[in-house]
Amino acid sequence: MTSPRKSEPGPEARGGQEDWRAGVVEELAEHIAAIEAGEAAPGEGSNPLRGGVFRDHETEKVVVKECRYVLGLLGHRQRSEAEIRAKLAQRVHEVDVLEEIMRRLDTAGLIDDEGFARAWVEQRRESKLLGTAALRRELEDKGVAAPDIDTVLAETAPYDSEKERCQILARERLAKELRKSGGAENLDRGAALRRIGGALARRGYSENLTLFVLNRELDAAGVTWS
């Protein structure tokens, strides 16, 4: 199911999320302590990461410890389901235990590939000025499913914004070419198109958009065909 687009949380919302996570971690610590002391484990209560005792107390300790480990990972940045699963698979070798951990994380709302993809796209567009094709490749590498990628890219990639980012990169690259060649009169337009076009393609911009933007920038800079 496609979730509505989430706006950037304000300070109050972020503070509430941090308080919630702190509460979850505290409850998990109490849960582990109770199990280690041989006491009856608390029921689910308000914490979806605590599900009573899974199989036995020793296994339950593993489950809640790994849930806490994932919370630590998510404290640094959001992660896709595939990333979380891969991290856990390095630490947990019993399939049913790993699946129980994933189930609890999902119940707690900590697995959200569409939300992860949206945050990833916004961050990478801002920091690296990546185009849609490059972002799609990165999300595929992160294990995000095609429908989630399509949804996020469709709502966050209007043509005008893509063109603006392409123009910024094209101008930066062209400025370097002009400095190296000593001016527009010394710059080979065909060679500049190939070099800058290749750089933009590697950033994920389409050939049609790249040619459109580059030719306009070259015209504006006075770079002619030799």
PLM-predicted stretches and their roles:
Residues 1-226:
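An alpha-helical, amphipathic repeat domain used for nucleic-acid recognition
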